[in-house]
Every structure is written in C-alpha cells, then in structure tokens.
Amino acid sequence: MEEKQHYSPGLDGVIAAETHISYLDTQSSQILIRGYDLIELSETKSYLELVHLLLEGRLPEESEMETLERKINSASSLPADHLRLLELLPEDTHPMDGLRTGLSALAGYDRQIDDRSPSANKERAYQLLGKMPALTAASYRIINKKEPILPLQTLSYSANFLYMMTGKLPSSLEEQIFDRSLVLYSEHEMPNSTFAARVIASTHSDLYGALTGAVASLKGNLHGGANEAVMYLLLEAKTTSDFEQLLQTKLKRKEKIMGFGHRVYMKKMDPRALMMKEALQQLCDKAGDHRLYEMCEAGERLMEKEKGLYPNLDYYAAPVYWMLGIPIPLYTPIFFSARTSGLCAHVIEQHANNRLFRPRVSYMGPRYQTKS
C-alpha cells in the first residue's frame, strides 16, 4: 500500500527553496534582505542601492553607484519597433497584459539569451531594470492612445519613472516617497510570483520567460492586483463614515476586502504598510487635505476590531500612488517593476544551484476502472 504523503494546500508552510536573498522574520517583525532590515534600508537607501544589494550581494560604494546609474540610464529607452508592437494591442488591454507582452518581446533583442551564467543574467537584469519604467509607462499610455513620454537623463530613476507616468516633474518629497515605495516592493522572500519565476527558471528557461510568468502571477488580485482594488474601494466613499459603512456592508455579505491580511503576517501589521502610512500622512499634510488618511485609518481600526486583520503594503500604497497622481491601472505594474530586482536575484540564484521543481499530487479520483 502506498504511504500517505502530507498535503499542504497552497504549499502553506512548505519550505520550497534555500536562499541567501531574503527572509521574513515574523518573530522580530523584520524583512531581511541579504541580512539587512528592509525597513531600515527604506529610510536611508535608494531603490538603485537596493538593486545593487540584491544582485551583487552587498551595498554599493559611491563609485559603484555612479557606474550603476550610468548603466541604468543608458538602458532606459525602448526600441522603436518594440513600441509599435504595443500599439497593436486593443484599447481595453490591461497595463499588466501590455507589460507582459512587452517584457516577453524584449527576449527577441537578446542575442546571448541562452547564456544563463550569473554574469550574463546580472547584465541582463540591469538592462531590464533600466527599461522597466519606460515599458510600464509606455504600455499604459500607448494603450490609451497617448504618446509615450521619453525619459530625461537629468532625472533620477524614481523621478523619471514618475515623470513618464504622470507627465509632470515630481517634487523632492514626491520623488523620495515614490522611491521608498519601490524599495518596499523590491523583494519579499517567496510569494506566488517569485515561486512561479523560480519554477520556470528551474527548467533552464531564460530570465525573460521566468519574469513573464511572474507578471501573470502578479496580475491576480490575491497577489498584486490588490492595490488597485483598494483604491477603487476608497473612491466609493466620500467621508470616513461612508467608508466604514461600506466596509461593514461588505463584511455582512462575506465579501473579501482587499488590502487586509497576509499569509505570513497573520497576527501583525505588515511593517511595510507602516512606512506607507507615514508617507500618506506626509502627502496629505502637504496637500492640506487629510480625508484619505482619515478614511484609511478608520478602515484599519474597523478591520482589526471586526476581523482581527491588519493592513498590508497594498492598503496604504494605493492612496499614496493616488496622491502622487498615478493612474490606478498602473499600480500593479509599478509593483512588478519594483519587484523585478528581487525576481532577477531569485532567477540567478535558481540557475546557479538548480533542481527541477517536480512535486506530486494526492490523487482523489477513482482507481482501476474497467471498460463496461
């Protein structure tokens, strides 16, 4: 008789890989990135410094930062025929689908695509990271029949990203807050999209293929699409009491409310959400309008009281992006663009110490049926 194997739905609690990249230490409420606390990094380091840490395993020296910035800037434009491909997409295409198509198509420009060595994949990752802001912004603008906005060499990575999405030059506060959001979204151990990327990479597929699979995973509203759902929900209410009533109605109907709860942070607030909550308050202070902040706080209190659930990063990132003037359909593509750095690190690690993922199933169907 076959031995009964343990089954864990959703692979909950299953250790699927060994990694040197990141770890969610729920006991100390820390998100460790190469041994550093992500929250502390978000207060003092830029997104590009996080990119270097993730891909090189250490924080950069000043001279290395200058080299990295030049490399990223030199890769910030998209080929003209690549933009024409995006023009062929239907008008109602979601930007995540445009992003997935555009990312997959970039593989055709790589003449060394079969070289999966760490050095080749790192160089590929830097090139991709240079193009992600332009691809994210251009796919949205082209689908909506608008001209893409070209990057400005005088702007920082995050300022350029914001500029290409909104068409306006960001203030120093807006640039700082957006950059911090990219840091917070950059890496998070083994969520669904990272697992998908590593599974694909384990077949010796290329970096583009692994990232394209991750885009498809991140589009789902149980993973990345939650930030868009949060903002649409907030826009349904005009006042704090309206929002509380809206949440109560949804709870009575047993509807899922996006932006709350997390598979890992089950009994605590996502520490990244606290950073975005502070950022939202800063933006509301600057605007002289605290309505969104007060609504979010009221929702946070209500969900903790009624369901014992705490906000995750998406809950506060959504209104932050709204205050920055970013169109809602771009929220999830931003998430993916930021996470590209972590995903690339995971694919490189998977290729370097690979074993093909091949799990089994617990069969629940009939056995040994015969033809009548």
Swiss-Prot record:
Positions that bind substrate: H188, R272, R339, R358
Signal peptide positions (record): none
Binding site for CoA: K256, I257, M258, G259, F260
This protein's record includes keyword Transferase: yes
Superkingdom as given in the UniProt entry: Bacteria
Pathway: Carbohydrate metabolism; tricarboxylic acid cycle; isocitrate from oxaloacetate: step 1/2
One of the GO biological process terms: propionate metabolic process, methylcitrate cycle
Alphabetical UniProt keywords: Sporulation, Transferase, Tricarboxylic acid cycle
Induction details: Subject to catabolite repression.
Matching InterPro entries: Citrate_synth-like_lrg_a-sub, Citrate_synth-like_sm_a-sub, Citrate_synthase, Citrate_synthase_AS, Citrate_synthase_bac-typ, Citrate_synthase_sf
An MF annotation (GO) of this entry: 2-methylcitrate synthase activity
EC number: 2.3.3.-, 2.3.3.16
Role this protein plays: Involved in both the tricarboxylic acid (TCA) and methylcitric acid cycles. Has both 2-methylcitrate synthase and citrate synthase activities. Catalyzes the condensation of propionyl-CoA and oxaloacetate to yield 2-methylcitrate (2-MC) and CoA, and the condensation of acetyl-CoA and oxaloacetate to yield citrate and CoA. Has 2.3-fold higher activity as a 2-methylcitrate synthase. Catalyzes the formation of either (2S,3R)- or (2R,3S)-2-methylcitrate.
Note, other: Bifunctionality as a citrate and 2-methylcitrate synthase is likely important in the mother cell's physiological milieu.
Protein family membership: Belongs to the citrate synthase family.
Descriptive protein name: Citrate/2-methylcitrate synthase
Annotated organism of origin: Bacillus subtilis (strain 168)
